[in-house]
């Protein structure tokens, strides 16, 4: 199983466009419903910082087959002031965070 957090900061004029691209990823995920995969995206209160939390039981991750994710990734560097940084994590404890 792999788990990671990806964090980046968009340019202020690109934050809403980024959020729309993220919503398109979730729309496709809700249609295709890949198993063994959990994903959430957070927009922080500064409105330009985004955090993605990914947990996948499969390798490669099913997110790589999502067309909307490819479209999201295609222009990510151009939308960002701070590029995405991915960090692998190990869960210490959780209350219903990855279930349900």
Residue ranges of each PLM-predicted region?
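An amphipathic, aromatic/His-enriched active-site/gating alpha helix that lines ligand/cofactor pockets
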Residues: 24, 28-38, 54-89
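Short, well-ordered beta-strand segments in beta-rich or mixed alpha/beta enzyme
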Residues: 2-9, 37-70, 100
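Short, surface-exposed ligand-recognition loops at beta-strand->loop->(often short) alpha-helix junctions
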Residues: 9-20
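Residue-level signal for secondary-structure boundary sites
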Residues: 14-16, 60-62, 94
């Amino acid at each position: 199983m792999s788990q990671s957090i990806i964090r980046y900061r968009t340019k202020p004029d690109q934050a809403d466009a980024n959020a729309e691209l993220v919503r398109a990823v979730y729309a496709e995920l809700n249609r295709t419903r890949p198993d063994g995969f959990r994903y959430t995206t957070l927009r922080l209160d500064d409105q330009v910082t985004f955090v993605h939390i990914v947990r996948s039981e499969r390798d490669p991750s099913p997110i790589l087959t999502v067309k909307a994710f490819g479209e999201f990734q295609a222009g990510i560097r151009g939308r960002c002031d701070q590029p995405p940084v991915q960090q692998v994590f190990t869960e210490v404890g959780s209350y219903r965070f990855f279930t349900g």
